[in-house]
């Protein structure tokens, strides 16, 4: 078991017949994920990699008991896909799609939260949990072969893979890795994701990967200082050299209105006793020290 | 997309807000003509999408059309914080009694709209936050509830207006207009700074700023068109990058950076900086980039006058190392080779195949990113 997924997680893939949806469905199946159904309006009755396709999420839920969803739907339709999943009764929605207008995300995410549904993303790599061989996302399978007790929560995709790889090479195993997404508004933000994984008794240490923009890192540091999280943590913050006013690839990675720079995030972590790695490659070493190995 | 002041003001006006008469000009002659039409003293405002134009000489008052013409000849072509003045907004000069600050943004933490209001205006919100944080009022609006009477009332009271006066009503309708612009235009920011009370007693947005979410531009074709005709703060490289399908941000060093994924690319920049080098740019080829995207991205850096060394840091998952190597090969072939040094670190999918392809080009592949970053910095110094 992990905090967000377990052996009973049954996944529906929204946008399963698209290029990305189809490709990653295969990868998720290979990893061991229970992908029980797919949804593409108009393609009901077909199959993708042996997975039955329906016209609505409601039908996928009714016939297969799907309780989680991964969304690969194009940006213009993605917010509606979230609402559909929520109304169909799934508990967890992972939105891979990038470029969703932020006002639409705002409405969809608020609606989901009001119904008690957890949304990961948008614009995220998803989540992967090696102990239960379950992946709702696009992470490379080969990096997440070693189950263990480290949780990784991150605002970035490839940097998550890089740091997870370094952790595994250093002898750590992964409990769960969650990429919360690079957009300004996301369903579960970095601070909330850290709080969730900290509640898992199987998690011994938490790696937080932050970046410029917003104040999720500062809020997380505050939560840690107040004792809401009492597990060893190590942080890394990307974008020390990012200039203000420029979006660094992610829609949410921007230093704006005088806040969100890497320096203030690093200082916030250090001030409450969370060590911050100078480079991504220093993370395993710092974690080993935190866990007194 | 950052709207020019005149575009933002037109939006305010469309939503029923009174603004000083004015028009935008592209030549000194036009400036003179508009000044004649308006009559009396006018303000010339350089239309560049940066804050702090005034201090940089981008705002001038002219008493006569002739003076407006003279000032305009100097203002056109001026460089303000890296942007060249091509348009001047000519508006009627108004005497100001009092200046306030009012803006609307999306608050990430609460996932709500957030008004920031201050009875002090004319300076950046950062400045107010630093010197008089107690003067800033925050009013949160849940998108599912929308802007209500009590939100507006608390903002307008905070700005110092007496209930049920004409000024109160004017200010209230500005708050409402800003909210409607925010929602209707998918804006990230709607700001009026200063929001002013004039000598005549009107409440008007003396300056206005609107930033529209790039991801929502498809819903507003007229803005898309305006951006195409006038790219404002987007550099030539950035425009090109967007067309091809990668992210590019110009920086001022000499080590060209290519990475895949925003976080990893930022970390790659930081790594170069950590070892004493200076990144020339941020270039993220994105997830699952094809050889063509890699080729075009690399060509940008091969042609970049400031770039001495190119450092590629690729962590393959969906992105395949052989596809990246093929892109490098194609770029070098099209450019007829290069004198610039290329340092590549690549991990992941089809790594061995990629290594063999790069070896043929005489480019060694690094396994360790730190070692590669050190090498890139060393080569840039040589």
Swiss-Prot record, chain B:
GO terms for molecular function: ATP binding; magnesium ion binding; succinate-CoA ligase (ADP-forming) activity; succinate-CoA ligase (GDP-forming) activity. Keywords: ATP-binding, Ligase, Magnesium, Metal-binding, Nucleotide-binding, Tricarboxylic acid cycle. Gene3D superfamilies: ATP-grasp fold, A domain, ATP-grasp fold, B domain, Succinyl-CoA synthetase domains. It is an enzyme of class 6 (ligase). ATP binds at residues 45, 52-54, 94, 99. SUPFAM superfamilies: Glutathione synthetase ATP-binding domain-like (SSF56059), Succinyl-CoA synthetase domains (SSF52210). Mg(2+) binds at residues 193, 207. It holds the Pfam family Ligase_CoA. GO terms for biological process: succinyl-CoA metabolic process; tricarboxylic acid cycle. Its EC number is 6.2.1.5. Disulfide bonds: none annotated. Residues 9-240 form the ATP-grasp domain. It catalyses: succinate + ATP + CoA = succinyl-CoA + ADP + phosphate; GTP + succinate + CoA = succinyl-CoA + GDP + phosphate. GO terms for cellular component: succinate-CoA ligase complex. PROSITE patterns: ATP_GRASP (PS50975), SUCCINYL_COA_LIG_3 (PS01217). Binds 1 Mg(2+) ion per subunit. Pathway: Carbohydrate metabolism; tricarboxylic acid cycle; succinate from succinyl-CoA (ligase route): step 1/1. Substrate binds at residues 260, 317-319. Its cofactor is Mg(2+). Belongs to the succinate/malate CoA ligase beta subunit family. NCBIfam families: PRK00696.1, sucCoAbeta. Heterotetramer of two alpha and two beta subunits. Succinyl-CoA synthetase functions in the citric acid cycle (TCA), coupling the hydrolysis of succinyl-CoA to the synthesis of either ATP or GTP and thus represents the only step of substrate-level phosphorylation in the TCA. The beta subunit provides nucleotide specificity of the enzyme and binds the substrate succinate, while the binding sites for coenzyme A and phosphate are found in the alpha subunit. This is Succinate--CoA ligase [ADP-forming] subunit beta. The gene is sucC.
């Amino acid at each position: 078991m992990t905090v967000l997924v377990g052996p009973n997680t049954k996944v529906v893939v929204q946008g399963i017949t698209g290029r990305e949806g189809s490709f990653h469905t295969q990868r998720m199946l290979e990893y061991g994920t229970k992908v029980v159904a797919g949804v593409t309006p108009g393609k009901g009755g077909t199959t993708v990699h042996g997975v039955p396709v329906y016209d609505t999420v409601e039908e996928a839920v009714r016939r297969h008991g799907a309780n989680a969803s991964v969304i690969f739907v194009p940006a213009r339709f993605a917010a509606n896909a979230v609402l559909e999943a929520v109304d169909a009764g799934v508990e967890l929605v992972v939105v891979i799609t990038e470029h969703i207008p932020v006002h639409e995300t705002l409405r969809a995410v608020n609606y989901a939260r009001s119904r008690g549904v957890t949304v990961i993303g948008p614009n995220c790599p998803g989540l992967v949990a090696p102990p239960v061989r379950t992946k709702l996302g696009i992470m490379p399978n080969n990096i997440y072969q070693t189950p263990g007790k480290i949780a990784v929560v991150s605002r970035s995709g490839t940097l998550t893979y890089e740091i997870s790889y370094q952790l595994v090479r250093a002898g750590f195993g992964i409990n769960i890795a969650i990429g919360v997404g690079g957009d300004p508004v996301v369903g579960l933000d970095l601070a909330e994701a850290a709080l969730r994984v900290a509640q898992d008794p199987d998690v011994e240490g938490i790696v937080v990967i932050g970046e410029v923009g917003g104040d999720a890192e500062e809020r997380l540091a505050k939560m840690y200082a107040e004792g809401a999280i009492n597990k060893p943590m190590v942080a890394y913050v990307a974008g020390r050299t990012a200039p203000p006013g420029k979006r660094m690839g992610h829609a949410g990675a921007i230093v704006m209105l005088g806040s969100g720079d890497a320096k203030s995030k690093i200082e916030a972590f250090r001030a409450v006793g969370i060590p911050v790695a100078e480079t991504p490659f220093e993370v395993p070493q710092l974690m080993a020290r935190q866990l007194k190995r | 997309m950052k709207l020019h002041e005149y575009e933002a003001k037109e939006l305010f006006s469309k939503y029923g807000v009174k603004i000083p008469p004015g028009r935008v000009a592209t030549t000194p002659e036009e400036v003179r003509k508009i000044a004649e039409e308006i009559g009396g003293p006018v303000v010339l405002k350089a239309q560049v999408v940066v804050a702090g134009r005034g201090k940089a000489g981008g705002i001038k008052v002219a008493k006569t059309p002739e003076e407006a013409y003279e000032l305009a000849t100097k203002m056109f072509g001026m460089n303000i914080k890296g942007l060249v003045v091509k348009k001047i907004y000519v508006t009627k000069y108004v005497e100001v009694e009092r200046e306030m600050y009012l803006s609307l943004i999306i608050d990430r933490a609460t996932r709500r709209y957030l008004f920031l209001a201050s009875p002090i205006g004319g300076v950046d919100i950062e400045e107010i936050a630093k010197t008089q944080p107690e003067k800033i009022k925050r009013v949160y609006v849940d998108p599912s509830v929308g802007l209500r009477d009590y939100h507006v009332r608390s903002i307008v009271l905070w700005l110092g207006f007496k209930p049920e006066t004409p000024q109160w009503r004017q200010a209230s309708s500005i708050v409402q207009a800003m909210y409607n612009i925010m929602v209707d235009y998918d804006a990230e920011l709607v700001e009026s700074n200063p929001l002013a009370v004039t000598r005549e007693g009107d409440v008007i947005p003396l300056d206005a700023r609107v930033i529209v979410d790039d991801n929502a531009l498809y819903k507003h074709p007229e803005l898309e068109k305006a951006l195409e005709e006038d790219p404002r703060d987007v550099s030539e490289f950035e425009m090109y990058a967007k067309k091809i399908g990668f992210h590019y941000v110009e920086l001022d060093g000499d080590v060209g950076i290519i990475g895949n994924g925003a976080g990893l690319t930022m970390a790659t920049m930081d790594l170069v900086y950590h070892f004493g080098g200076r990144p020339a740019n941020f270039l993220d080829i994105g997830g699952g980039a094809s050889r063509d995207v890699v080729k075009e991205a690399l060509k940008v850096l091969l042609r970049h006058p400031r770039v001495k060394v190119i450092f590629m840091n690729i962590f393959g998952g969906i992105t395949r190392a052989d596809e990246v190597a093929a892109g490098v090969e194609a770029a070098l072939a099209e450019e007829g080779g290069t004198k610039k040094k290329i340092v590549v670190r690549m991990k992941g999918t089809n790594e061995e195949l990629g290594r063999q392809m790069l070896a043929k080009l005489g480019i060694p592949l690094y396994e360790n990113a730190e070692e590669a970053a050190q090498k890139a910095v060393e080569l840039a110094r040589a």
